[in-house]
């Protein structure tokens, strides 16, 4: 789904047979979700929250972009029809089970944490991570961040603004290899909780997403090197995630009516030292979600709109900010490093 336009252009340039089949109207070009939904129900369609990531969708018109289709040489006839997030695809594999919702995982994660509440904001930390903000019923563009359809049905459409982080848990898999740490010995949250560092680590192995958008480069070590204490490097790696969250939140400030009082965090990477660091860095309390998989819960909420969840039980631990001059100096050091090495 991600950046499908350039992928389409590359494939038809490299494969003349594929190009001819597309030209003859024999094939649809679309994301995996569209392939699966058609395979299971026989209904062709790509829903809007995923279509947004193709570089072929015009978020203002709610349709495929004529400019982008022309740019990448994509014929509208080879694209599946656009459908809302909540849509009657039919029954799956001749069963009595209907397919009624197809949605992007980060959209579902925010719905799982905050429903469709306007102005809601949440974080999700898995292999990668993201900060998601419900911008309401008007598409909103923020420099450095991604704007998408958040939710849609036949009557209404909501939009979200999101900052993605390429490496969260995958960062620690990378450091296992770089530092020669066995996977079962990493325990990054334990290592980070007992260690402090003045160093800065910029993870370049998988590139940087929001708000810098840089392709892969060599990791940057500042006041660190691979001969440093490995726990210190792990701590600096964890802090890089927090710094990116802070940078994304600063990008969001102009479109938020007020500073959030609580930032909820879900996903397997939502561990105590990271959440405390984010709270200290941003000055916003961070709540650890009681439910590990908020993505699946988001789907449940869409399918059961009358279900009333108990918001008082949505977090089991709140990390309150502990302001300090040291954290301010560390943030400035990060920003200076990004200015020097990235921008």
Locations of the language-model features?
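Gly/charged, well-structured mid-domain segments that form the phosphate/adenylate-handling core
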Residues: 82-88
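Active-site core segments that coordinate phosphate-bearing ligands/cofactors
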Residues: 2-45, 50, 55-66, 70-71, ...
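A structural motif corresponding to the C-terminal end of an alpha-helix
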Residues: 71-78
